[in-house]
Amino acid sequence: PGVRRNERLPLLVMLHGCGQDAEALAASSRMNLVAARERFFVLYPEQDRLSNAAGCWNWYDTRSGRAQAEAGSIDAAIRQVCLLQAVDPERIALAGLSAGAGMAALLALRHPDRFRAIAMHSGIAPGVAHSSATALMAMCGQRAAPISPERLASEARLPGLLVIQGSSDPVVAPSNGAEAVRLWAARGGAKAGARRIVQRGARYAAVITDYRSRSRVVATLCEIEGLGHAW
């Protein structure tokens, strides 16, 4: 978007899923059109195929340090964009699809004060996987044990979370979306409000549940009826 003198605009960081690249996510999400209309910057980091042949972010590989290294590279890219463009550092948000959602969650947990909000689309709840095998199990809705909310982050307040999950997702079990929201809500002392159904025209209906702590929305679960593993 055209930036006026002394103006600072928000930044949205979009993280692609497996088998995608930055260009594919930009095209499927049409986020550039939204950014031009609503006036914000978009950054599309791209996974190195030498790091993962399928183009997946290694969000789960925290034991070897690969996940943290990739998160650090993305964070460095964000810092660089903030130096080069008129970005408002107080209005930076993360969004990710599938493996990108897992990496977005990791970034938010590592830097809870850096980001205003995070959106996880068809992703895995943070902390439930630490290897490719456990990641695949989590995708199928299997996990060894529930994760304690206290393990998520330090005492810093987590950024607001939006989880988008399709009810017909054949890749990531819908229970993962609910688990991510459960962890975020428990960590923030939030309670679920009444579910509401939103449908616009012939689009898929969305069942939305807000989790609030007093007046603040800590997390929102958006379950889209009939949606598969797609933006």
PLM features: residue spans?
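Serine-hydrolase catalytic machinery in alpha/beta-hydrolase-like enzymes
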Residues: 1-3, 7-93, 97, 102-116, ...
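A generic secondary-structure signal marking the coil-to-beta-strand transition
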Residues: 11, 39-41, 160, 217-220
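The conserved beta1-alpha1 loop
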Residues: 13-17, 122, 165-166, 225
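Short, charged low-complexity intrinsically disordered segments located at boundaries
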Residues: 65, 103-105, 109, 209-221
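Hydrophobic anchor at the start of a short beta-strand
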Residues: 92, 118, 161, 219
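The feature captures the conserved acid-bearing segment of alpha/beta-hydrolase catalytic domains
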Residues: 126-217, 223-229
